[in-house]
Amino acid sequence: MRVACSKILLMFFFFGPLLGCEDEMEKHYERPDWLQGSAYEILQGKGQYSQFLHAIDLAGFKIIVDGQGLCTVFAPDDAQFMTYLHAHGWSSVDNVPLDSLKVLAGNHIVQYSYKPDDLMNFQPNGVLNPATNPGIYYKHKTFGKDPIQVVTNPKTGRKIEVYKREKYLPVLSTDLFHFKKLADLEYNYKYFFPNSQWKGDNQFYVANASVIEGGNGIPTDNGYLYLIDNTLKPLRNIYDIVEDPSKNYSVFKSLYDRFAAITYDAQLSEKYGATSNDSIYVYYHNSLPKIASEWTFNYEGGFTENIQVASGTAFNAFVPNDAALESFIHEFFPAYQSREDIPLLALEYLLSNHIKSSNIVLPEEIKAGKVTTTYGDACDFDVDRTDVKEMCTNGVFYGINKVLVPAPFKTVTKPLFQHSEYNMFMNLLYKTGEIIQLTNPDNDYTLFIPRDEAFEAMGIRLNIGNADILGDEKFEKLNVEDGKYVEMTALELSDLVAMHVVPQKITDFNKQQVFPTKKSLTYIKVFGGGVAGEQETDEAVQVVPLGEYSNGVTYESEQLIGKTDEVLTDVLTNTEYSKFWALMKKAGLWEEINGVITIPMLAGETAMVFAPTNAAIDAAGNIPQDSASLVTFLKYFFVTLESNKVANYVMPGIGDDGMYSTLSVDVANSNIYERKYFELGLYQDVDNFRLRLTNDKGTKQCYTLSGKYPRFTTDGIIYQIETTDIQPE
């Protein structure tokens, strides 16, 4: 008996706490007293929401609202709901076409659960730092979406079925207005919703409605319920307004549709077209903001979701009406016979300057001059005189009566877009990402634009690829060995562009000068009324002024301006430098590896070489005969940029005057801890277009050949001097 009692006590000792724990778990999962049921049940209990619930039933959303899945419900009462139906010609819920009813009812149900604090200041990454961009993430995905739409493909004229995505519902909180430092909160809200009630600060407004007293964030079994004072009108997307025949934006639409990308979607076709064997498409626009989508995030970058972009990014549309846009096209594009002839690239800059993807832009910001377009131009239109002002599911729409001219149309790149004969160079600048850089208002540029035939003369052509897809173009050059065209590399394209862009203004082409291009250690020469590249030539490429702009000047060049492809040893082994090179060989300062001649002492560094002429060497009486002394003697004619920590060669008008370390070692002043090098003085004589050289003590001097450019190579430049008597003391 004692043993049995002991066993019972032990069992109670071990399992008693577990029984108590089970009671606690049951309490944890008990329905909280403060939950009042599903949103559907709560609305049923209130009595005056029967019309809204009837719409929910008919539209097929009862299962969601009644507890299956997280959702946030915004409910208008019977009076408000019927007022909306009557205003749209429906006498009862049963009279509303099912597709329209699904959109309307679904527009009141937001996916996922949002408590009041979330709607005031939604933070996609949680509430770790609620002060970050308060109110910016302002729109939320609903269950409302338009039915599959039959549209005409603007490229083919064929009828197709296009899938429409779920609409987003804007929730504008006064936190957003304060974050943007707006003074008149009511003005910014009622600008888009003039017939809605303003209920003051510290509120959020659900599109055209506000929350009524006692209806703010009622907890439900599967989310939250908000009682609102107005029926939420389903919002259009930006493209819906553009294609609305009652509005005046048909020109903008026709240009935008030049970029139409209507893509077959196998998954959507299987899901929505299975019964009718129909093909379902999605309607986007290549290279431009996807204003035909209800969403501002459309799986870009291969991601399936991006809440920050979906909730916080708006397509801010500043769309010019037909009269304004037609007038601009006629004035700016006189070289093109019709709108269809204008290149896609020009249209991309024009159109994207009117659709800014950013956080939502509100009217007071525009008034205050705080808003710029995609390319940094001022949004200088009168917001109170817009043709259309509308909050959309994917942004905001301002219908304006002027064109916001993009920066590339007003700066040194302007002629590219106005003249068809510059099409290749326009595309070249685009491919290399230079067009936007050339709009920088803080710089002065000189831009040389070759005509298309100049490219063709050099065996370069533009392969258009798919003419409907901007960016599919490829530059190709002729391979003279087999007569075939091969695609040019990114480096080749970059080098070609650089030789036509000088980061300063050039106005005098008769004075002999040299200018650095936008690429490090590449240069153009100016003389004889024109320009030349780095190759050795006595003939200048003639230029024709095209215009002077706020950030520089633009010229047409009759030929391409070329970059040298020679290296130092290619030039030094020429007859012109034969005596100097013979001394280099005698001193052992060269090496041949697999047929390639190199100068090992340069070790890949970039050098300025001051080579005595053949006549100077013949006349010299100071050339050492022993090898070691000859090495010291010859190295004094070499100055590398890297050892002197400078970024530019010294040329007339370029670089800094002063003493430069050569490669010649000053043995007397060197030790095992530090090696000293003899210095050579370099001083510009711009008037005579030459350099003056002095030895380390300034006791000897000589000049480079007057009026003669150095020889440019990819790894240095070579000046000729008329004496060897410049050695250090």
Regions found by a protein language model. Name each.
Residues 1-21:
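Sec-dependent bacterial lipoprotein signal peptides
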Residues 21-729:
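Mature, structured domains of secreted/extracytosolic soluble proteins
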